[in-house]
A protein has these predicted regions:
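A short, Lys/Arg-rich alpha-helix, primarily the initiator
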Residues: 1-27
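Conserved hydrophobic/aromatic packing and binding residues within compact polymer-binding modules
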Residues: 20, 34-35, 50-53, 79
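Acidic-residue sensor for enzyme active/binding pockets
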Residues: 31, 54, 64
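Recognition helix of helix-turn-helix/homeodomain-like DNA-binding domains
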Residues: 39-60, 82
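DNA major-groove recognition helix of helix-turn-helix/homeodomain DNA-binding modules
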Residues: 57, 61-78
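Residue at a beta-strand N-cap/secondary-structure junction
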Residues: 17, 28, 44, 59-62
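Short basic helix-loop element that most often maps to the first helix and adjoining turn
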Residues: 18-40, 67
C-alpha cells in the first residue's frame, strides 16, 4: 500500500477490509466519497462503520460486498483474496 502504512493491526471480523482500503486509496477516493457512492447503491454505512470495516473489525454483508466491488470497480473475488 505504499506510503500509507496502517497504524493499527487488522482485526479478524472480515477478510476484505485491507483490499477495500487498497482499492480506495489507489483510486484517490476518500472514505466520505466512498460512503456517498455506496449510498447511491442503496447501502448506507456510517464513517465509523467504514473505518471498522477497513480495519477488519466489522463484519461485512453480502450486499455491502457487492456494492463495494461495484463502486471500487474491482472483482468480488479480488476483494475476497481469491484472485
Amino acid at each position: 500500500m505504499g506510503m500509507n502504512k496502517r497504524k493499527l493491526a487488522l482485526g479478524d471480523r472480515n477478510i476484505i477490509g485491507a483490499r477495500v482500503t487498497e482499492a480506495r486509496t489507489a483510486q484517490g477516493i476518500l472514505q466520505k466519497d466512498l460512503l456517498a457512492r455506496l449510498q447511491v447503491k442503496g447501502v448506507d454505512i456510517s464513517l465509523p462503520a467504514l473505518s471498522l470495516l477497513e480495519g477488519q473489525k466489522r463484519p461485512v454483508s453480502d450486499i455491502e460486498l457487492k456494492a463495494l466491488a461495484e463502486v471500487l470497480q474491482v472483482d468480488v473475488r479480488w476483494l475476497l483474496g481469491m484472485i
